[in-house]
Amino acid sequence: HLVNAGGIHYEPFGLYPGTETSLDNIDNATIAVPNDTTNEARALLLLQDNGYITLKDGVGLTATTKDIVENPHNITFVELEAAQVPRTLPEVSFGVLNGNYAMEAGLTVADDALLYESDDSEAAATYVNVIAVKEGNENLPKIKALVDTLKSDEIKQFINDNYNGGVIPYK
């Protein structure tokens, strides 16, 4: 049985510009989101966390567009296979992308994302990359030393310098 010895980093979802380059233009916008359950929920939570929509209480990481209870900006959602979202950016106002698809499209969180998941978001806490060890070994000195090293300021700086926000050190 494996357990979490420590969270190290996560890859944030981001909202990227399409035909619009500013969130000042979000009224009546069309936003492309991934259509698979996990990624669609992350996209919707990103928008909720930033005050653009409200989801039903408790849906969390199972949210779909059917769970939107308030949409004050009259946003239209286009649900697509995640790999298709970057290709549709010229045709939609904005798109919410997984980090890997953003990088493949030449986009970076640091330079291009208008919004991205914070390290205290539900998604970051759920999808953080961890050091997994056999249960009972999580408190061994060598495991603690490994986790401490991977969470050190030096490693955090390396991540920040090399991944343009596509990978973010976890708190």
Where are these regions (language model features)?
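A local structural motif
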Residues: 27-29, 52-79
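A bilobed periplasmic-binding-protein/Venus flytrap-type ligand-binding module shared by bacterial periplasmic
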Residues: 12-23, 127-140
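Ligand-binding "clamshell"
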Residues: 1-5, 20, 91, 96, ...
